[in-house]
């Protein structure tokens, strides 16, 4: 290994963060998460056709190539640790099914170059890169980012449809059949967020392997559900609709951009849930998961500062030394 990619501490060389001990190395964790993400990726291609595959490939390959180029320009070691591939794949799963490939490339390049590498690379980024890329695309291409198609509409003249969270969404059928379609994925939306079932299965796998903290998705989803009840909304609808499932299980649980303690993660998830509710209920956009998580990413250092447990032997600055107290 090159020393410029390591932090030297005495005689010990420590790799860059995240320093998470789960019995797996960081690359192994990344590749397990990547393998789990193949579940919603496969569902995306099944529901939305071949163009969804091009979106996934374009975003993932761009992320890897951009990270490779930047690392080489900075004369730092490039590692195929899987983090760039995860960023590219997650970004792709949050995009509309007809997103032009060139826009996908721009968003993926932004996610890696600006949201990740500009901060120093893996372990140093403040914001979730995939969500930062999605937010960038939403600002630059707002019309294209809100064009949705029902699964199966693969023809060139397919008509756009509203997502369930949109006020213009009209469902012809019973509430139970709507829940069923939202649970299995037969609704309009981003290519990787429509099937709650697939995302829940993926989340359970990660929790069972102890690769993510169960507190974040459970508290996040629970906050949205409880808040919906308080606001007089349909809790089941609010939980199944939009990007809540993919955000709770795969975005908010990011090691680097979420707090390090259980209490901190609980506060983080609660805040994300409340912000999601506020944006959905009072904001100009029907969906609030992306910006809710990004806002809480910004609060992560503050949460860690005040929630992180004090080390053994900690003494307040204002405290007097023991010998001084004895002499007084």
Each predicted region: which residue ranges?
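N-terminal signal-anchor module of multipass membrane proteins
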Residues: 1-64, 324-328
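Alpha-helical transmembrane segments in multi-pass membrane proteins
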Residues: 32-40, 55-67, 83-88, 92, ...
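Structural signature of hydrophobic alpha-helical transmembrane segments
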Residues: 49-61, 98-107, 182, 186-196, ...
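C-terminal ends of transmembrane helices
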Residues: 65-76, 112-124, 199-209, 249-258
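Membrane-interface helix-loop-helix junctions at boundaries between adjacent transmembrane segments
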Residues: 84, 89-157
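Hydrophobic alpha-helical transmembrane segments in multi-pass integral membrane proteins
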Residues: 99-100, 143-150, 231-238, 274-289
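Long hydrophobic alpha-helical segments that form multi-pass transmembrane helix bundles
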Residues: 124-200
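Loop-to-transmembrane alpha-helix initiation sites
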Residues: 126, 130, 237-244, 265-268, ...
């Amino acid at each position: 290994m090159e020393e410029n990619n390591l932090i030297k501490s005495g005689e010990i060389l420590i790799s860059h963060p995240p320093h998470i001990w789960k019995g797996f190395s960081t690359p192994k964790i990344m590749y397990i998460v990547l393998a789990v993400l193949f579940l919603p990726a496969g569902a995306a291609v099944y529901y939305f056709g071949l163009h969804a595959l091009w979106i996934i490939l374009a975003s993932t390959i761009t992320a890897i190539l951009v990270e490779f180029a930047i690392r080489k320009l900075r004369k730092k070691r490039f590692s195929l640790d899987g983090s760039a591939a995860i960023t590219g794949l997650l970004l792709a799963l949050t995009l509309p099914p007809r997103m032009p490939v060139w826009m996908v490339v721009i968003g993926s390049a932004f996610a890696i170059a600006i949201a990740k590498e500009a901060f120093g690379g893996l372990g140093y980024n403040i914001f979730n890169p995939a969500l930062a890329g999605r937010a960038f695309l939403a600002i630059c291409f707002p019309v294209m980012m809100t064009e949705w198609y029902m699964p199966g509409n693969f023809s060139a003249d397919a008509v756009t449809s509203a997502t369930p969270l949109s006020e213009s969404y009209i469902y012809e059928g019973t509430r139970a059949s709507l829940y069923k379609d939202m649970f299995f994925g037969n609704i309009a939306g981003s290519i990787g967020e429509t099937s709650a079932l697939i995302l829940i299965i993926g989340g359970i796998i990660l929790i069972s392997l102890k690769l993510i903290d169960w507190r974040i998705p459970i508290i996040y989803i629970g906050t949205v559900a409880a808040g919906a009840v308080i606001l007089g909304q349909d809790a089941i609808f609010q939980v199944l609709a939009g990007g809540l499932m993919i955000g709770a299980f795969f975005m908010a649980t990011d090691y680097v951009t979420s707090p390090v303690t259980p209490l901190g993660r609980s506060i983080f998830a609660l805040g994300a849930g409340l912000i999601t509710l506020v944006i959905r209920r009072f904001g100009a956009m029907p969906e609030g998961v992306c910006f809710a998580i990004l806002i809480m990413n910004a609060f992560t250092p503050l949460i860690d500062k005040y929630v992180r447990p004090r080390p053994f032997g900690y003494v307040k600055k204002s405290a007097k030394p023991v010998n001084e107290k004895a002499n007084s």
